From Swiss-Prot:
Span(s) of short sequence motif 'KMSKS' region: 600-604
Residues that coordinate or bind ATP: 603
Catalysed reactions, as listed in the record: tRNA(Leu) + L-leucine + ATP = L-leucyl-tRNA(Leu) + AMP + diphosphate
ATP-binding among keywords: yes
GO cellular component: cytosol
Gene behind this protein: leuS
Entry's family note: Belongs to the class-I aminoacyl-tRNA synthetase family.
Designated name of the protein: Leucine--tRNA ligase
EC number: 6.1.1.4
Length: 819
């Protein structure tokens, strides 16, 4: 019989859907298993095969766990708010909802074609009012706890996009989306007090089965450091400086303030006002990332003012420097150029003194004055001496600081969750009540922002201006919206109870499913999404509305999928199908030589591969199989369509084997042993997520199995059941072909018996003078004489004409003929 995926795959997809095979149930008699993908933003470009690596891995695990008898939750939804749909609306006038719904339909079609086993009954999009009603409610929980507040913040503002951008949305001073200039501005924004949870976020990492690299990234992002705050007196009040090296205090030769520091105006002398203003203007065009980059030179400007050193009482010049950030520490640093590389670059740039106060061993020198004797001390002893001095003289204190800053939560966009707050003229505000949610955005025609720092909602006066019946006052709705991160902070909880209209989730359902047992997604989310989700979850845990302190038990980052790209230097990328190889070089149709690279699949590089094209040619099961075979799950891998073709050839062979008339009711030990060993290898591979080894295990199995004169039916059934998580369509078809009722998953995961793993034969190596010459499969109970005779026969051409001086025999291991 012939294997034709085009005939069987859609049939079995309909069967799974009609029978609700993948519907998750809260069955208290079963152990639960929650396996989750980082849900996608439904872009217009659709999925390419690079997206399928993680999705295929989670699907294999979900199908395997169901077969083992677990109650499995494996859902999919859509992170559907976001800037791309809004930018498309600005260009075309198409409502973001319309664009999003169209893109979701395309994504669903692609995912269905791959045979992924999602519980479709739990599907939602973050832009569904039924969903973001609860996002708004959860935001108000943060607000009521004092964790959401408004503040004037120095932000990355893009005039062209008309919105605030995060550091991650900027590259080299330009927006990632569109490549528009970005500048720094002070704007009033909503902020979430994530710093209040800095210690919990750090401590919680120790309990997680996550990649160490991700844990370290989060630790670095939080950036906990111990030190001291030091007050430097000026005519306009003290400048507070945080330092991790109080032992170098005597070496301070300048202070540097962030351009946004509140004392800049007061400290700038009349003579310096013009140059300071120009410098601050130039700084506004730089992102924070640009400002702290490791550059050979540092920029700055003198304020014209001085501060008094708290120990020596000397006057120290006060500068403004863009490498100082207002959000870290106090927005001021003490310059110790002898012992800090950045400070040294700055001092050399502006001819400032360099005073050494530590020797090569780290012992304090040149650090004594009246009432202050630091010389000879080092390390923690020296630091503590300085802290004690500062505290006794009311000049500072011990302090712990964090790099982590409160989360800028506002966006000046339309396509995001409206913030459910009403503002009044006296500066007070009122959160909306539950019965007023969801707060829906108005229908608008113009999606462009309204002036600096105001989103498009600000233009809809009849929506903004309200009479609040609760307070009997006129008020204004908040016109900022939430960032795309908001919906993804808690979506994993909604999947526990996706269509609850009375609460974001029922407590008993959250208790049953949480935490997520396996979470797979890209490493690009190592910090922001994962940190923000952990932050919200820990708030919910403290509030008693979730049962676990952490949301994601085990995390795996899938590697990137690379594909060949072809670029005309200085012009751009071309499609692979029009590139030609001539005389060992790749050229464009114009004859221009191409720069050929292996790069991450992307729409911009024109090297993405549409999975539907491969499905149409080879079948979804072959694509799924190669998606795993292409390399270890967590490593980068190079995609090859030829590899998909190879997996299709294997499936052809597997189909022929199972449908062969050699399949009999037989207890052939060798056949059963091969099947049991296969199941054991596949089981181990799934448990360890070494999924790339599974296809080769099957290929080795079939190579040995087809040598049998008779195929034991029970062994064939074991192989089909073991293949089902990886290639589910063909497995369903073959399961029925073998005379079973539809639904291979219901048959359970095959059990492995030890006696079949051990087998009745053993493989030994045959050597001549220590060189491998043959391998032999022999019966375990074969005598030494039998083994030597078989070994001599297998190596006969190497022994011909030679005198065998000795035959070294190691039972069940080897025979070595010494000639």
């Amino acid at each position: 019989m012939r294997y034709d995926p085009g005939l069987i795959e859609e049939k079995w997809q309909k069967f799974w859907k009609n029978e609700q095979v993948f519907k998750a149930e809260e069955d208290e008699t079963k152990t639960k298993y929650y396996v989750l993908d980082m849900f996608p933003y439904p872009s217009g470009a659709g999925l390419h095969v690079g997206h399928l690596i993680g999705y295929t891995a989670t699907d294999i695990v979900a199908r395997y766990k169901r077969a083992q008898g677990f109650s499995v939750l494996h859902p999919m939804g859509w992170d559907s708010f976001g800037l791309p749909a809004e930018q498309y609306a600005i260009r075309t006038g198409t409502h973001p909802r319309e664009t999003t719904e169209k893109n979701i339909a395309n994504f669903k079609k692609q995912l269905t074609a791959m045979g992924f086993s999602y519980d479709e009954s739990r599907e939602f999009a973050t832009s569904d009012p039924e969903y973001y009603k609860w996002t708004q409610k959860l935001f108000l929980i943060l607000y009521e706890k004092g964790l959401a507040y408004m503040a004037d913040m120095a932000v990355n503002y893009c005039p062209e996009l008309g919105t605030v951008l995060s550091n991650e949305e900027i590259e080299n001073g330009f927006s990632v989306d569109g490549g528009y200039p970005v500048e720094r501005r002070m704007l009033r924004q909503w902020v979430l007090r994530i710093t209040a949870f800095a210690d919990q976020l750090l401590e919680g990492l120790d309990e997680l089965d996550w990649p160490e690299s991700v844990k370290q990234l989060q630790k670095n992002w939080i950036g906990k450091s111990s030190g001291a705050s030091v007050n430097f007196a000026t005519e306009h009040g003290a400048i507070e400086v945080f330092t991790t090296r109080p032992d170098t205090l005597i070496g301070v030769s300048f202070l540097a303030l962030a351009p946004e520091h509140p004392l800049v105006d007061l400290l700038t002398s009349d003579e310096q006002k013009a140059v300071v203003a120009q410098y601050i203007k130039e700084t506004q065009s730089k992102s924070e990332r640009d400002r702290i980059s490791e550059m050979k030179t540092k920029s700055g400007v003198f304020t014209g003012s001085y501060a008094k050193h708290p120990v020596t009482h000397e006057l120290i010049p006060i500068w403004i420097a863009d490498y100082v950030l207002i959000g870290f520490g106090s927005g001021a640093v003490m310059g110790v150029p002898a012992h800090d590389e950045r400070d040294l670059l700055f001092a050399e740039q502006f001819n400032l003194p360099v005073v050494s106060v530590l020797n090569k061993e780290g012992v304090c020198i040149n650090s004594c004055c009246e009432g202050f004797h630091l010389d000879g001390l080092s390390g923690e002893e020296a630091k503590q001496y300085v802290i004690n001095f500062l505290e006794e003289n009311h000049l500072g204190a011990a302090k712990i600081a964090y790099k982590l800053r409160d989360w800028l939560f506002s966006r000046q966009r339309y396509w995001g969750e409206p913030i459910p707050i009403i503002h009044f003229e006296d500066g007070s505000c009122r959160p909306l009540r539950d019965y007023e949610l969801p707060l829906l955005p108005p229908e608008i025609q113009d999606y462009r922002p309204e002036g600096v720092g105001q989103g498009p909602l600000a233009k809809v006066r009849e929506w903004v201006q309200v009479f609040d019946t609760e307070t009997q006052r006129a008020g204004k709705r908040e016109t900022h919206t939430m960032p795309q991160w908001a919906g993804s902070c808690w979506y994993y909880l909604r999947f526990c109870d996706a269509h609850n209209s009375a609460a974001p989730w029922a407590k008993e359902k959250e208790q049953y499913w949480m935490p997520v047992d396996l979470y797979i997604g890209g490493a690009e989310h190592a910090v922001l999404h994962l940190l923000y989700a952990r932050f919200w979850h820990q708030i919910f845990y403290e509030a008693g509305i979730v049962s676990t302190p952490e949301p994601f038990k085990k995390l795996v980052n899938q590697g990137l999928v690379l594909a060949t790209s072809y670029r005309i230097p200085g012009k751009g990328y071309i499609y692979p199908e029009i590139a030609k190889e001539e005389n060992g070089k790749w050229v464009a149709p114009s004859g221009e030589e191409l720069d050929v690279r292996q790069e991450k699949m992307s729409k911009s590089k024109l090297n993405g591969v549409d999975p539907q094209i491969l499905i149409d040619e080879f079948g979804a099961d072959a694509v799924r199989m190669y998606a795993m075979f292409s390399g270890p799950l967590d490593k980068n891998k190079l995609w090859s369509n030829q590899g998909v073709a190879g997996c299709r050839r294997f499936l052809n062979r597997f189909y022929e084997m199972v449908s062969s008339d050699r399949v009999k009711e037989d207890n052939n030990f060798e056949g059963l042993s091969l099947a049991h060993k296969l199941v054991q290898r596949v089981t181990d591979a799934i448990e360890k997520l070494s999924l790339n080894t599974i296809p080769s295990s099957f290929m080795e199995f079939i190579n040995d199995f087809v040598k049998l004169a008779v195929y034991p039916k029970s062994a064939v059934e074991m192989a089909v059941r073991a293949l089902a998580p990886i290639a589910p369509h063909i497995s369903e078809e073959l399961w029925v072909l073998l005379g079973n009722s539809p639904g291979v998953q219901k048959s359970g995961w095959p059990s492995v018996l030890p006696e079949y793993l051990e087998g009745q034969t053993v493989t030994i190596v045959v050597q001549v003078n220590g060189k491998l010459r043959a391998r032999l499969d022999i019966m375990k109970d074969a005598s030494k004489e039998e083994v030597l005779a078989l070994a001599r026969e297998s190596a006969s051409k190497y022994l011909e004409g030679c005198e065998v001086k000795e035959a070294i025999f190691v039972p069940a291991r080897l025979v070595n003929f010494v000639v």
